[in-house]
């Protein structure tokens, strides 16, 4: 029984999800239905948390919009998500960046992660 469920979940999972970590700035394009119209909406911000649970994986993106902090949780393999693009790599030491909720301005900045050559 368990193998059948795993097989079905594997078929439902997206294969084109880019590798990103907490601290990275990402742009998530989401399909939004307004009345009879369907359009793409971009949500760009910093990944503050990732929850890896196979098909049920999710990640939280935080951005500042008009001086107000906005967080949105996305299901990684949801059909509502059109694309995920990594804009900038961030260097952080924690897996959950919930401390950014209390910070504003320069203290909320994240250093850019530089990849080693070698």
UniProtKB/Swiss-Prot annotation:
| Transport keyword on record | no
What PROSITE patterns does UniProt report for this protein, alphabetically? RIBOSOMAL_L19 (PS01015)
Protein keywords: Ribonucleoprotein, Ribosomal protein
Which top-level group of life is the source organism from?
A: Bacteria
Q: Name any GO cellular component annotation.
A: cytosolic large ribosomal subunit
Biological processes annotated in GO = translation
Q: Which GO terms describe its molecular function?
A: structural constituent of ribosome
**Would the keyword Ribosomal protein turn up in this protein's UniProt record?**
yes
As for family, the record states: Belongs to the bacterial ribosomal protein bL19 family.
Summary of the function given for this chain in its UniProt record: This protein is located at the 30S-50S ribosomal subunit interface and may play a role in the structure and function of the aminoacyl-tRNA binding site.
What name is this protein filed under?
A: Large ribosomal subunit protein bL19
**Source species, please?**
Serratia proteamaculans (strain 568)
């Amino acid at each position: 029984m368990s193998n059948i469920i795993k097989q079905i979940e594997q078929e439902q999972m997206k294969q084109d999800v880019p590798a990103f970590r907490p601290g990275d700035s990402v742009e998530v394009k989401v399909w939004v239905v307004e009345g009879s119209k369907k359009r793409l909406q971009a949500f760009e911000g910093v990944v503050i948390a990732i929850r890896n649970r196979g098909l049920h994986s999710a990640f939280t993106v935080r951005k500042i919009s008009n001086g107000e902090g906005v967080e949105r949780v996305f299901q990684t393999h949801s059909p509502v998500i059109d694309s995920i693009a990594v804009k900038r790599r961030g260097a952080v030491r924690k897996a959950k960046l919930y401390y950014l909720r209390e910070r504003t301005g320069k203290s909320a900045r994240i250093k850019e992660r530089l990849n080693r050559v070698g």
